[in-house]
């Protein structure tokens, strides 16, 4: 079986797993996102883009959230996926994700050690970083990794620079295996596709995404299947901090 077949099978399993929120059917958002043009100027640094809170605005937001969610699920590097998202939606120039290292420590749980296949005495490092594109904090990541399974240079970069984890270890040609993927914000209420009475939204108020919109948990492995990192990523509402797509 090819790597592409493996990824297709993995996505199928994830798609069937019950999540805290249902995922918009791929056929719907794939069509929708083709017709969501990007604002000509993009989002100004530090601005808060005002989206209308009506049905169309909420449907656009949902389609874009699901578009990002599937991009994250179908690629091994969340860092490079966010690079592309930042560039496509003109959130900053240059469109490059950087990490802001927070000097705190969170010991790995027994479950994390089990996922990483390490014993109770083996060293596991912790890296806590917001991931920023320009002035926009797009996600925050808790990362536990086994330094003995990285190169000396990779460990140096992780310990001394603002390089995002996925970029620092890119040379390992790692694979990402999703443990869970949850949509934390659902802009439309349950039953929206059936013309629910709940679809009467106020048009005079802006649509403001909450602080957290998507959460992923994943394990990264070497090409031979050896795990070396477990990551918990929480994506912020700032992923939509660009002008609402223009309407006809």
Stretch-by-stretch model annotation:
Residues 4, 22, 109-112:
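Charged/polar low-complexity intrinsically disordered segments
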Residues 17, 22-23, 35, 128:
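Hydrophobic alpha-helical segments, especially transmembrane helices
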Residues 42-126, 130-132, 136-199, 204-214, ...:
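N-terminal domain-onset segments
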